[in-house]
Amino acid sequence: MKSYFNEFFWAFHPSIEGFKHCRLVLTIDGTHLYGKYNKIVMIAMGCDRNNQFFPLAFALTDGENVESWGWFLACIRNRVTQMRDLCVISNCYPGIMVVLVDVYLGWSKPNAYHRICMHHLASNFMTHFKDKCLKQLLCRATLETKIEKFNMLMDTIGRINQDTLNWLEAILFEKWALSHDGCQRYDIMTTNMSKVFNSVPKGA
C-alpha cells in the first residue's frame, strides 16, 4: 500500500530567527506545482530592512480553499511567529479573505492587518469594468499618499462611472489605498515578493 500526504508545511530555523529582524510585513500567495504531482505550493515571504526578499514559510496542499489557507496561516502563527502588528498582503481570493478575519487564527486586528495586492485589485477591476482609463485612475488612487488627492481621484472615477466608484467603496480603503494604510504595509503594494518564487516549482 502506498502512503502519501495531503499537506506538508515547512520553515527553516534560520528563516524563523531572521524574521525577528525583518519588517512587520508578509506577502502570501499560492502556485501550482509543475510535474506529475497535482499540488499547490503556498508561500509566505518577508521583507528585510534593506527591502530584500526574505523567504519564510512554505506548504504543499491539494488546493486553495478556506481550510488550506486557514491551516497554512495557523502553522505560521503556531510554528513561525507570534509577533503582533503584522501586515499580510495577499490577493483577493475569498479563502484568504475569510481566514484573515477569523479571530481564532490570530490574523485579525490588532494581531495583524490585511492589505490587498494592487495588481490583483486592478486585475479584478478589469474583469468587472474593462476600462483601461479607469484602471489607470485606480492605480493612481492606490499609490496616492495624500487623502485630499485620493478623494479627488475617486471623485473623477465616480463622474466617469458611478458603478466603478460603488465597487471600490465596497472595499475598505485601508486595504488597498496607501493614503489610508496607516503605515502598515511599508509601501509594499504587491505580492511580487511571493510571485518571484512562483517559478521555482517549475524545476520540481
Predicted stretch roles:
Residues 1-204:
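DNA-binding interface regions
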